[in-house]
């Protein structure tokens, strides 16, 4: 009979099959009350599942990440329970866990309003407050299908027909009169599901296919306790204030419109930020000894067939035809860079060759996934490809890592999560090649004192990769940087160099992106700084204002001086009260406001005020220019006197 080994190494012997809940109760009533599920030999199981052989067991509670995920999954079932009570003819599709919550896709004969969502959430709370038990039953495939057929659940029947083997025994979870199907595990009792909030609805095609019916997707968040939920909702409220779409409109940075979905219309101030960011990256490229190149906007489909993109990626590619030839608008820059590498004979002495491009790329993203600057169809990659020998990989990766941290630190990002994705089951190349490649990436990270986690099997078929994920001031994760080894593409496109032994060899290619998409990174920065861009990035760095018309000439003279000093400055000579002007430019997040009255004109000075409302007093014009130039040149994140 089973011997259960607990995480601390202690063992418990039983003369009968036991469940995780039985073991938890054996340990103590407190643990039994907290038990959500179990992890048996590394696999999550329901609290009620029986263990009849020797096993390693960990009791899962709400304090565990897995426990919180189970709570969220069960809240999706709770949503299903509630919606079927309110609108019994609703057909349930899928209800998975997502970051911070869950959603459920439903087929309902009404457009859900905010009032409906509030009513649904109220019913969910009423049901959860009864603390009913969730009963799991394993049944035959046919029994499951019959159960859903009797309820008219056509989507559940389709899942059974298309995704579940006839030999399988699906798990049916009974929430009183409501039944849902899932692999599980789920909470044993609804007392764990009291802290949730329904958030929004959207449209979603069944199985993500636009040829299928559009369903309504209901999103929710769920947490282990009241405090966690309140904290998350507060972060959401702050995120809403920082929404780059809202700030972009307030600051007149860009717009988008229906005639060009997913394409950005940059306005002057937004384009100023873009160009400053581009200039910063270009400076770093020069420092790290990259060539800058420019590839064509589109190439013949034949090229994309050679690379494998047409076979694996064509749904995301825009195409056009001319003179009986089909062209693909590039979704990425790498094939073009290989073509540039292939021009002229290369020797091992020419390597490493570092090639960078601000590449204008297009991808046919689903319209429903488009989101401001964060998810677009037309974007600019700060892309680079390094062609090198196998022996040079480690040093080149090391240099890439230094460049990543060098650039991220400029923007104040301190929390960077790093993951190393290793060989997948289906891959090209020998085990020896993968051993060396993975070891080189790991060694480069270690040499830079960077902590990282392995993601086994998550590498591309053509090579391992490092991913860099930024965490912003709200602790949201943004995956931006990538260092990816590629043992496939150079060979596919006949790239070669002459080695030391005078034989042609295929170079290793390193794909390197740091900001990722320039558009997306500007969106991230807009939300990180809440529109209060550091002075070097701010579209307008200084506004000079007069109090009356008598100071107009002085303001114009100062404006010219600051322009000559390389400072982005505007004069505001409008016949408005100075308080009105200050408020307007404060709302526009202009870093510095210089006020000129008769006293300042007479003394040859300016009254300096920051957008945060700090009065820096009356300063000499030359001193202001010098300090501003230093702040801009150093790309400081802080303003004067901060």
Curated annotation (Swiss-Prot):
Cofactor: Zn(2+)
Residues annotated to bind Zn(2+): 334, 385, 511
Summary of subunit composition and partner proteins: Homodimer.
Protein EC: 6.1.1.3
Enzyme class label: ligase
Keywords of this entry: Aminoacyl-tRNA synthetase, ATP-binding, Cytoplasm, Ligase, Metal-binding, Nucleotide-binding, Protein biosynthesis, RNA-binding, tRNA-binding, Zinc
Comment on bound cofactor: Binds 1 zinc ion per subunit.
Localization, UniProt: Cytoplasm
GO cellular component: cytosol
Reactions this protein catalyses: tRNA(Thr) + L-threonine + ATP = L-threonyl-tRNA(Thr) + AMP + diphosphate + H(+)
UniProt record, GO biological process: threonyl-tRNA aminoacylation
Function field: Catalyzes the attachment of threonine to tRNA(Thr) in a two-step reaction: L-threonine is first activated by ATP to form Thr-AMP and then transferred to the acceptor end of tRNA(Thr). Also edits incorrectly charged L-seryl-tRNA(Thr).
InterPro entries in alphabetical order: aa-tRNA-synt_IIb, aa-tRNA-synth_II, aa-tRNA-synth_II/BPL/LPL, Anticodon-bd, Anticodon-bd_dom_sf, Beta-grasp_dom_sf, TGS, TGS-like
Family listed: Belongs to the class-II aminoacyl-tRNA synthetase family.
The species this protein was found in: Pectobacterium carotovorum subsp. carotovorum (strain PC1)
Cystine residue pairs: none
Domain of life: Bacteria
Protein name stated in the entry: Threonine--tRNA ligase
Single GO term (MF): threonine-tRNA ligase activity
């Amino acid at each position: 009979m089973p011997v259960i080994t607990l995480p601390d190494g202690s063992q418990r012997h039983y003369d009968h099959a036991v469940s995780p809940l039985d073991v938890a109760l054996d340990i103590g009533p407190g643990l039994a009350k907290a038990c959500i599920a179990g992890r048996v030999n590394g696999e999550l199981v329901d609290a009620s599942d029986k263990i009849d052989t020797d096993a390693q067991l960990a009791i899962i509670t709400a304090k565990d990440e897995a426990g919180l995920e189970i709570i969220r999954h069960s809240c999706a079932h709770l949503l299903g329970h509630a919606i079927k009570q309110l609108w019994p003819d609703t057909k349930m599709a899928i209800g998975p866990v997502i970051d911070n919550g869950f959603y459920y896709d439903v087929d309902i004969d009404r457009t859900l309003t905010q009032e409906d969502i509030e009513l649904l959430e109220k019913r969910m709370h009423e049901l959860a407050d009864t603390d009913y038990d969730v009963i799991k039953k394993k049944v035959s495939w046919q029994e499951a299908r019959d159960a859903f057929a009797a309820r008219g659940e056509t989507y559940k029947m389709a899942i059974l027909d298309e995704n579940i083997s006839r030999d399988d025994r699906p798990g049916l979870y009974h929430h009183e009169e409501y039944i849902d199907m899932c692999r599980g595990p789920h909470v044993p009792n609804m007392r764990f599901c009291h802290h949730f909030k329904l958030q929004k609805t959207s449209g979603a095609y069944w199985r993500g296919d636009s040829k299928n019916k559009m369903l309504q997707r209901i999103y929710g968040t769920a947490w282990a306790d009241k405090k966690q939920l309140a904290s998350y909702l507060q972060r959401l409220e702050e995120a809403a204030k920082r929404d780059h779409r809202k700030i972009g409109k307030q600051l007149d940075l860009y717009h988008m419109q229906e005639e060009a979905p997913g394409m950005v219309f940059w306005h002057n101030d937004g384009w100023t930020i873009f160009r400053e960011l581009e200039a910063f990256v270009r400076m770093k490229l020069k420092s790290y000894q990259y060539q800058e190149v420019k590839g064509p906007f589109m190439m013949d489909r034949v090229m994309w067939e050679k690379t494998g993109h047409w076979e694996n990626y064509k749904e995301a590619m825009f195409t056009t035809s001319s003179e009986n030839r089909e062209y693909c608008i590039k979704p990425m820059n790498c094939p073009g860079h290989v073509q540039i590498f292939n021009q002229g004979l290369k020797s091992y002495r020419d390597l490493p060759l570092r090639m960078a491009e601000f590449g204008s790329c297009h991808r046919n993203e689903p319209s429903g996934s488009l989101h401001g600057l964060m998810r677009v169809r037309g974007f600019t990659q700060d892309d680079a490809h390094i062609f090198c020998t196998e022996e040079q990989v480690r040093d080149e990766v090391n240099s890439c890592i230094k460049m990543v941290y060098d650039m991220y630190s400029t923007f104040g990002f301190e929390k960077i999560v790093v993951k190393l994705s290793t060989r997948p089951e289906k891959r090209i190349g020998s085990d020896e090649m993968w051993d060396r490649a993975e070891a080189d990436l790991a060694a480069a990270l270690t040499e830079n004192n960077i902590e990282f986690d392995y993601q086994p099997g998550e590498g591309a078929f053509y090579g391992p990769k490092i991913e860099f994920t930024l965490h912003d001031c709200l602790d949201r994760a943004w995956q931006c940087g990538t260092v990816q080894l590629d043992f496939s593409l150079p060979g596919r496109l006949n790239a070669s160099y002459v080695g030391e032994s005078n034989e042609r060899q295929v170079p290793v290619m390193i794909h390197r992106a740091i900001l990722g998409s320039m558009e997306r990174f500007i969106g991230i920065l807009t939300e990180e700084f809440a529109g209060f861009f550091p002075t070097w990035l701010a579209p307008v760095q200084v506004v000079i204002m007069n109090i009356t018309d008598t100071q107009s000439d002085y303001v114009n003279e100062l404006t010219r001086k600051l322009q000559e000093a390389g400072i982005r400055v505007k004069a505001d000579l409008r016949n408005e009260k100075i308080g009105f002007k200050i408020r307007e430019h404060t709302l526009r997040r202009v870093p510095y406001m210089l006020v000129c009255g008769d006293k300042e004109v007479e003394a040859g000075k300016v009254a300096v005020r920051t957008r945060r409302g700090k009065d820096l007093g009356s300063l000499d014009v030359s001193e202001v220019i010098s300090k501003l130039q230093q702040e801009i040149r150093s790309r400081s994140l802080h303003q004067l006197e901060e």
